[in-house]
Amino acid sequence: MPEGHVIHRLARALDAQFGGETVQVSSPQGRFADSAALVDGHTLVTAQAWGKHLFVDFDAPVAEHLLHIHLGLIGKLGLAPLAAPVGVVRLRISDGEVAADLRGPQICRLVTEADREQVVARLGPDPIREDADPERAWQRIHRSAKPIASLLMDQQVSAGVGNIYRAEVLFRQHIKPSCPGNTLRRASFDAIWQDLVVLMRDGVEVGRIDTVTPEHSPEATGRTAREDAHGGEVYVYRRADLPCLVCGHRVRSALLEGRNLYWCGTCQRRH
């Protein structure tokens, strides 16, 4: 599932290409045709991301003028020069030159302002957004006995954080993944949050997740650069049984609530 920085990049791309423009909205697949017709031929006002949720605002004179998208595990949204649709395209937004095609989303629906407010109200603060309030995340974390590794993946705690950012921020802050939220020190939470802000906003800018500091980079250490579909240089994510880039001990992995968790038992001992 794409992490939050991907959704923010998509919002930026839609704004840059279509913002303020009259667009054609269609459903080549046909499944979204009735809803697409309601906003077809209207101006795309803006696109915004909250965590892993994308909302696209049209100036159509209907209550349900907001397009709500959640890509889920397999969904994809991409912009390309206008051409005949390829594959199963649920939704297409086009200005006649460029098309944004949506395939396989978990959510694709038109909603009202009130609907959007309900969705956003259920989400925790998004580290990428300027209006994020980390205190809301702290209040949920320090009242819970669940492991911090579980809590960070809870979208009601921190919106947009996924498996990669979860593993990497805990490593970078030396936090034991099994540390219960109600024993995590406030200083540790503050460090986690600030690091998420830096890492995730950097992900928006560069389009990939890079978490390794210069002294541990391939250039500095002479090691082979990472080759992975997710791009980016990371410390522990998908590095199970390989030596830790800092201490040399084996990176560990385990299933936690159905997702693979990666950590270094030597480097990550703090609470």
Region annotations inferred by a language model:
Residues 1-271:
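Structured catalytic/nucleic-acid-binding cores of DNA maintenance enzymes
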